[in-house]
C-alpha cells in the first residue's frame, strides 16, 4: 500500500533521511524503530504529504503522491489519519467535538451521522459516554484513547501512529498496545507505528524496520529482529550503552 523509494530530506545541513527505502503491504502493521530524533516522525510526514522529499518518491496505492493534482491529493489524504504523539486535542472542545472535528470541519457527514460515528469510535476505544468531558478532565491514557477515536472516526484505510505510548505508565502503555492490535484486527487497516519502545514493537508489529542514519538498515518479523546478527540493531533492541551506536554516529 505504501512504498518509499530513495527518500532524501535535509533541514539546513542536517541530512535526516538518506536514501530511505521501505515498503508496507496492505492490511499489515509495520513498526519503525530507532532512536529519538532519527527521522521517524519526518518519515510519517512524508507519507501523509506534509513534507516533500528533496529527492525520491512516495507511493500510496501505486500513486506517486507528488504527481497528483490537488483534488486527488485531498481525496487520498481522507483515506489516511494520524495519531499524534501528544494526542493534539483541542482544549476548548469537549471529547465529542474533538472526535468528530474532522467530519464536521470538512462537511463529510451530517451532524446526526457525526454523533453516531463519535459514539461508535469512543466505544471501540472503551470510552463510552465521555463525550461531554473536557480534555483537562482526562488522564494521559484517556487522552491517547480519545486521539485514537478521532483518528478512526473518519474510517481511514491507513493509520499512522507517532510514538503512541510516550508519556504514559507501563500498564497504560500495554493497554494502548492491545487497543492498537484490536483495532487493526477489527478495522483491517494498514498501520505504520513509529516508536523506540521495544515492548510495544514486539506486541503490535507484523513486521519491524529499524531506521538508522537516515536509512532502513534491517527489516523482518519480530522474531527475526529479536534474533538478528546486526550489531547496531542488537544494541538498540537490548538498550545497551556500549556498541556501534553513539551520539556522534547517530547524528
Residue ranges and their predicted role:
Residues 159-162:
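Catalytic Walker B motif of ABC-type/P-loop ATPase nucleotide-binding domains
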Amino acid at each position: 500500500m505504501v512504498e518509499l523509494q530513495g527518500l532524501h530530506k535535509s533541514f539546513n545541513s542536517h541530512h535526516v533521511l538518506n536514501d530511505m527505502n521501505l515498503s508496507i503491504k496492505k492490511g499489515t502493521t509495520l513498526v519503525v524503530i530507532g532512536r529519538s530524533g532519527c527521522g521517524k516522525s519526518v518519515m510519517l510526514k512524508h507519507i501523509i504529504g506534509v513534507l516533500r522529499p528533496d529527492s525520491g518518491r512516495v507511493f500510496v496505492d501505486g500513486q506517486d503522491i507528488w504527481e497528483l493534482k490537488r483534488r486527488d491529493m485531498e481525496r487520498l489524504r481522507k483515506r489516511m489519519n494520524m495519531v499524534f504523539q501528544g494526542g493534539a486535542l483541542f482544549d476548548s472542545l469537549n471529547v465529542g467535538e474533538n472526535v468528530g472535528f474532522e467530519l464536521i470541519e470538512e462537511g463529510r457527514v451530517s451532524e446526526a451521522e457525526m454523533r453516531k460515528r463519535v459514539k461508535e469510535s469512543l466505544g471501540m476505544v472503551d470510552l463510552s459516554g465521555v463525550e461531554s468531558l473536557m480534555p483537562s478532565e482526562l488522564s494521559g491514557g484517556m487522552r491517547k484513547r480519545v486521539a485514537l477515536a478521532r483518528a478512526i472516526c473518519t474510517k481511514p484505510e491507513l493509520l499512522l501512529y507517532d510514538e503512541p505510548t510516550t508519556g504514559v505508565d507501563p500498564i497504560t502503555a500495554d493497554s494502548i498496545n492491545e487497543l492498537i492490535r484490536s483495532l487493526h484486527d477489527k478495522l483491517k487497516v494498514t498501520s505504520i507505528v513509529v516508536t523506540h519502545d521495544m515492548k510495544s514493537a514486539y506486541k503490535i508489529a507484523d513486521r519491524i524496520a529499524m531506521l538508522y542514519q537516515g536509512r532502513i538498515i534491517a527489516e523482518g518479523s519480530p522474531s527475526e529482529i529479536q534474533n538478528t546478527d546486526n550489531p547496531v540493531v542488537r544494541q538498540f533492541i537490548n538498550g545497551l550503552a556500549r556498541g556501534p551506536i553513539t551520539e556522534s554516529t547517530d547524528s
